[in-house]
């Protein structure tokens, strides 16, 4: 018996919702933009093999890999429930660039924990599993935030509420929006991107942030796409993180002049996103970004839609 789970890329913050808003995305051409994890019956308590395009960027030691730590916390939770942990042989297919702003660590965490849970016949419920995912994300980034793991696991656009035992809630979005995702091929560690932010903000920035986020959520629920797009503004992180992203300002300006409804930094960068409601505009922006924002062979551009499913089983073998 074995199971393979795919976990999609995600946009943390979506510009307007620092640490509280996230969206899962998948390319419209059907290609997989995310990590996969296989869990199979093992002869030892735990073994891990790593494959994929970005396997060279992973720690050499198994004990330093986040998938190993996912197994440890999963074992801890099963022990609390007096449920037997099965010996497992795990394989991580690392397709996501690390430090990309696409929720790379979340992809590995979500795929690993979802696959472990399915392999053990779902002993943990959705909220319990999501809490573990947040714990693992905090281990990597240094702070607890669900804006990548929640959409990666649950799909769609997710708003983090973290009250009444509820971690996140889905937000209705717009079916005709395309999301152009451009990764330049350089690395921006989340911890470094957080360190550059100020410890205090001006009152007018706090007011603006509340207005934009409240306006965006309201516009999504009332299905006003033009208003929602106007609200996608970041006064918390983008003004400070721009300096870490070569060419971002010019790329955003081009995207907006070319017809994008909104454009911003995905997560802590360096990936940027541009929202379009016209496929030809999205493709034109994608071509320009490939020529002008991508810096090396590791970079890429995808025209995406929101991934409404989140993590999912893709078979029993990689």
From Swiss-Prot:
Molecular-function annotations in GO: ATP binding; homoserine kinase activity
Binding site for ATP: 97-107
Pathway recorded for this protein: Amino-acid biosynthesis; L-threonine biosynthesis; L-threonine from L-aspartate: step 4/5
Organism listed in the record: Photobacterium profundum (strain SS9)
Keyword Cell membrane among record annotations: no
Family: Belongs to the GHMP kinase family. Homoserine kinase subfamily.
GO CC terms: cytoplasm
EC number(s) stated in the UniProt entry for this protein: 2.7.1.39
InterPro entries: GHMP_kinase_C_dom, GHMP_kinase_C_sf, GHMP_kinase_N_dom, GHMP_knse_ATP-bd_CS, Homoserine_kinase, Ribosomal_Su5_D2-typ_SF, Ribsml_uS5_D2-typ_fold_subgr
Keywords: Amino-acid biosynthesis, ATP-binding, Cytoplasm, Kinase, Nucleotide-binding, Threonine biosynthesis, Transferase
Cytoplasm found in the keyword field: yes
Location(s) in or outside the cell: Cytoplasm
Chief subcellular location: cytoplasm
GO terms (BP aspect): threonine biosynthetic process
Role according to the record: Catalyzes the ATP-dependent phosphorylation of L-homoserine to L-homoserine phosphate.
Name assigned to this protein: Homoserine kinase
Family matches, as HAMAP family: Homoser_kinase
Catalytic activity: L-homoserine + ATP = O-phospho-L-homoserine + ADP + H(+)
SUPFAM superfamilies (alphabetical): GHMP Kinase, C-terminal domain, Ribosomal protein S5 domain 2-like
């Amino acid at each position: 018996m074995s199971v393979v789970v795919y976990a999609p890329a995600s946009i943390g913050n979506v510009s307007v919702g620092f640490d509280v808003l996230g969206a899962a995305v998948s390319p419209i051409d059907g290609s997989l933009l995310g990590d996969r994890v296989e869990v199979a019956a093992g002869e030892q308590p735990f073994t891990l093999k790593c494959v994929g395009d970005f396997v060279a960027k992973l720690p050499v030691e198994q004990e330093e890999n986040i998938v190993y730590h996912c197994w440890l916390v999963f074992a801890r939770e099963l022990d609390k429930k007096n449920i037997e942990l099965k010996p497992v042989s795990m394989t991580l297919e690392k397709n996501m660039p690390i430090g990309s702003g696409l929720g790379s660590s979340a992809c590995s965490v979500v795929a690993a924990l979802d696959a472990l849970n399915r392999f053990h016949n779902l002993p943990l419920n959705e909220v319990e599993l999501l809490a573990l995912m947040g714990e693992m994300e905090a281990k990597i980034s240094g702070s607890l935030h669900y804006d990548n793991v929640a959409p990666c696991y649950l799909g769609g656009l997710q708003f983090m509420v973290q009250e009444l035992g509820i971690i996140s809630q889905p937000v209705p979005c717009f079916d005709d929006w395309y999301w152009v995702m451009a990764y330049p091929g350089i690395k921006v560690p989340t911890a470094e991107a957080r360190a550059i932010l100020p410890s205090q903000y001006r009152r007018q920035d706090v007011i603006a942030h509340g207005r934009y986020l409240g306006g965006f959520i309201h516009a999504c629920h009332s299905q006003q796409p033009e208003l929602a797009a106007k609200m996608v503004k970041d006064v918390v992180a983008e003004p400070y993180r721009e300096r870490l992203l070569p060419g971002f300002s010019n790329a955003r300006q081009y995207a907006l002049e070319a017809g994008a409804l909104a454009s911003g930094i995905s997560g802590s960068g360096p990936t940027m996103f541009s929202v379009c409601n016209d496929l030809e505009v999205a493709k034109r922006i994608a071509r320009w970004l490939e020529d002008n924002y991508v810096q090396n062979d590791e970079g890429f551009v995808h025209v995406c839609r929101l991934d409404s499913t989140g993590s999912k089983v893709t078979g029993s073998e990689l």
